Amino acid sequence: MANVRARIELMVGQKSNIPAEMLSFEGLETDKEHVAVVFNQADKHQSTPLVRMHSECLTGDVFHSSRCDCGEQLEETINRMSESGGIILYLRQEGRGIGLYNKLDAYELQSQGMNTYEANNHLGFGDDLRDFKEAAQMLEALNISKIKLVTNNPKKIKDIQNYGIEIDEVVNTHAHVKQGNEHYLHSKAAHGHKLNFDK
């Protein structure tokens, strides 16, 4: 059974001006160091908190790569949760589970014309290797069984429900279109992601 091992206060966001708490865990399925970032003590004060399961993306989250919209989705969620409260489950699942170096190899294939899924397949991987059991374990450690899920990804909805978490509402993020990620976003939409390109 997973438990919270530590709870640390810190300031987050692009300007480091948003108060939050970062939680670490013990007893998860693997030894990956997933964390929860909690805003406005949502785990203590909200019966159905806003939750985003955000898979680590070094290139997008840290270096603001033009290849994806991960950093923009993360920042949008931080800003939303700074006002309404919520929990980001930051999961160490780089490259939809294939790892950083393999993702960089996939980037090279994308530069040659493949889309993000074709590149992963060419390297011998499935479209999405992520499993969200540990996300469910983290929520259970916080005594949370019902959430409002921030996602555009139907796989996340299905997977977290399969692990016993009830979804009260699905909240979409914006389609953060910029030079360099249009093909990537349209590939995701073709694979079922709910993206509104009109906004």
Swiss-Prot record:
Residues where Zn(2+) binds: 57, 68, 70
A Gene Ontology cellular-component term: cytosol
UniProt-listed CDD domains: GTP_cyclohydro2
Keyword GTP-binding: yes
Keywords on record: GTP-binding, Hydrolase, Metal-binding, Nucleotide-binding, Riboflavin biosynthesis, Zinc
Catalytic activity, reaction form: GTP + 4 H2O = 2,5-diamino-6-hydroxy-4-(5-phosphoribosylamino)-pyrimidine + formate + 2 phosphate + 3 H(+)
Active site: 128, 130
A single GO molecular function term of this UniProt record: GTP binding
Gene3D superfamilies, A to Z: GTP cyclohydrolase II
One Pfam family recorded for the sequence: GTP_cyclohydro2
GO biological process: riboflavin biosynthetic process
Signal peptide: none
Keyword Signal applies: no
Cofactor note: Binds 1 zinc ion per subunit.
Names of the cofactor(s): Zn(2+)
Top-level taxonomic group: Bacteria
Pathway this chain belongs to: Cofactor biosynthesis; riboflavin biosynthesis; 5-amino-6-(D-ribitylamino)uracil from GTP: step 1/4
EC numbers on record: 3.5.4.25
Top class in the EC scheme: hydrolase
NCBIfam families referenced in this protein's UniProt entry, alphabetically: PRK00393.1
Function statement: Catalyzes the conversion of GTP to 2,5-diamino-6-ribosylamino-4(3H)-pyrimidinone 5'-phosphate (DARP), formate and pyrophosphate.
Family, as annotated: Belongs to the GTP cyclohydrolase II family.
Protein name: GTP cyclohydrolase-2
